[in-house]
Amino acid sequence: VSLLMAFMATVIGTTVGGALSFFASRNLARHYATYFVTRRMLEIARTVPDIVWALIFIYPFGVGPLAGILALIIHTTGAQGKLFAEVNENIDHKAIEGIRASGGNWYEEIRFAVLPQVMPNFISYTFWRLALNVQAATVMGFVGAGGIGHELITAVKLLYFLDAGAILLMIICTVFMIDMSSEKLRHWIIGKETLVGS
């Protein structure tokens, strides 16, 4: 359940955050009001800890994985949106000027000038976020928001220390494997980007 929570939160949060990042980038937003409002929304979503979001969602939705998934989605959206916006603000503007000179609209600028430059970083940060969300999904169980953390806290309360130790070991191994895999994928993507750039 924890892995599924982390995966869903990463996919949905990264997709929404990625889309909002273009409106939260000072160099891409067409209107300052759009930039300001979107940026503040992302900052609020990112600044409030995911565990606090989980406690907020437990009130209307009750104890269970739904509250945990929603909490992770909100926090991931804010974190990824803010991070992606900073990536967007460091792009080379020559490609945008070329699209604009040929009569392209804002969406065509994003599609053909911005995305090719930022996509490698977007993918790299997405894998990094997945590893973070696996750890966060584990903690969600401590407040009744689903995940393997709930099984761990139950085992500790019932004094099933052998079971608790096994669960803890499984959590550590899972996080370690995902972290190592995502790190290798990030290095592979960055290395590929370097080769293409050269």
Predicted regions and their residues:
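Short amphipathic alpha-helical coupling elements at transmembrane boundaries
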Residues: V1, F36-R46, E86-A101, F112, ...
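Transmembrane alpha-helix signature in integral membrane proteins
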Residues: V1-A24
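Short loop segments and helix-boundary regions at transmembrane helix junctions
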Residues: A24-T38
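Generic hydrophobic transmembrane alpha-helix motif, especially the helices
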Residues: L42-I73
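Membrane-cytosol interface at the C-terminal ends of specific transmembrane alpha-helices
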Residues: V63-V114, P120-R129, M180
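C-terminal transmembrane helix and the adjacent membrane-cytosol boundary/short C-terminal tail
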Residues: S124, G165-S198
